[in-house]
Amino acid sequence: MSNLLFSHSYYYRLDPKQWKNKTPFPPLGTLYAASLLRENGFDVSLFDTNLLDSPKSIEPVLKTQQPTYLVVYDDGFNYLTKMCLTIMREACFEMIQLGKNYNCTVIVCSSDATDHYEDYIKMGADYILQGEGEITLLELVKTLDNKNPIENIKGIVFRKDKAIQVNPKREVLQDLD
C-alpha cells in the first residue's frame, strides 16, 4: 500500500495573536484522518507544523520519506482563528509546491480549500476534499491505489482534462461511533 505523509498548514509563529497566547492545540482533525488511514493498512507519517517557522521545514521529510501522497489536512476546530488567515493559505500553497517538487500526489482538506478550491487546484493540488474529509480521503486513496476511476467519489474536486471537476458533496456523518 502507498505511504502517506500527513501535515497541516498552521504555523503558530505566523499568527501573532495566537503565538502571543501561547496555547497551541494539537491538530486533531489531521490526527483522526491519519489514524483512519493507518487502521486501513496504509503506511502513515505525521509532520506537525504547529511550532515550526516555515513551510520549507517539511522539505527534508519529503526528501527522505518520498511519500506517495502529501495530505495537508487542516482542522475544522477553531477554524476562524486558524485556517482562514491569508498567510496560512500561502503556507499551504508553498507546501503544495514542495510536495509536487517531490512527485507527491497532493491532497488538501480545509475549510479554506473547500471555499476556494480553484485557487488550490491552480497552485498544484491534485485533489481537494470538501467538508468532512476522513471517509472521502480513505475512498480516494484506495481508488487511486487500485487505479480505478475517481469520477464517482463524493466530496472531491480535481482537474479533469483542463477543467475543474466538482463532484457532489458527501453526506455529513450521522453515526460518530
Predicted regions and their residues:
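Radical SAM [4Fe-4S] cluster-binding motif and immediate context
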Residues: 25, 176-177
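Short glycine-enriched, charge-decorated loop/helix-capping segments at active-site entrances
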Residues: 19-24, 83-87
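Glycine-rich beta-alpha loop elements in corrinoid/cobalamin-binding modules
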Residues: 29, 36, 40, 45-175
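Sequence-level motif detector for i,i+2 pairs with an aromatic at +2
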Residues: 1-2, 162
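Short glycine-rich His-centered loop
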Residues: 2-23
